[in-house]
């Protein structure tokens, strides 16, 4: 036994491999442990290759239903199902230089909060397009109740297979919507076609650090929980798709930190919502469970934002006038 231990200790990583490993940033102690585990027989490549990431635990999709729609608004505000309430929408939309003379489309309209605030604040005529039938129906009902069914209607639209919009617009806004679309080039080309000359298109969206991020267990969990299968790309790929569609990029900025601040601010008041619901007794248990599911949903998103695997970026794209 003692002889076996002595032989085990004699197994060392050759010096020429040590030097190469130090230069390339590998852990020599880890390499030595692997070499001993293999009885001293292994190639340099075998000793330095990355261990496969553990498989991600399966996560159920968090689909939209009446209860989730209700709970989301308790967290994010009436008409909103994610970060960025009226003040944020107005502030970010100043890049669009909106006026009552303009018409605009909102891609990924959600419950219609952003569309309605733009119509009310700037007098713009809005068409909102949402890929979730349940969100679109609820959003249209809210527009009707606000007396904005004509100025800010919300329509259900299959963004994956869209071929045309029913009219042309002066402005466009896509708020965290493109990451759910696989055929981005097609959608962006259709948007470009239905924007008038010298129009602006404002986009905020989730983008990944690089394509390897898709293999990260935490990213895979995030992908599996989304109600619509996500197809995120890198920021460079997003810019390339916009330019391919015919747009010129005026703004390209990482707003992840600001986005995380908005998430934290909204959830800071969630404990008050939980306290109020708790006082209602057993009949509030479904709502409380829904809030916990929503918290887990957003925790998975924020986790990969903080690690840098996922980012939120803002783009302002311009459709130049055609010289005739």
Describe these PLM feature segments:
Residues 163-172:
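A short acidic, Gly/Pro-enriched loop at the edge of an enzyme's catalytic core
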Residues 82-100:
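Conserved alpha-helix/loop element of class I SAM-dependent methyltransferases that forms part
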Residues 105, 114-161:
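Class I SAM-dependent methyltransferase SAM/SAH-binding core
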Residues 8-16, 30, 251-324:
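Conserved Class I S-adenosyl-L-methionine
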Residues 101-110:
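Conserved class I S-adenosyl-L-methionine
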Residues 2-61:
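N-terminal auxiliary segments of SAM/dcSAM-dependent transferases
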Residues 185-200:
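A short glycine-rich, Lys/Arg-flanked "PGG" loop and its adjoining helix->strand segment in the class I
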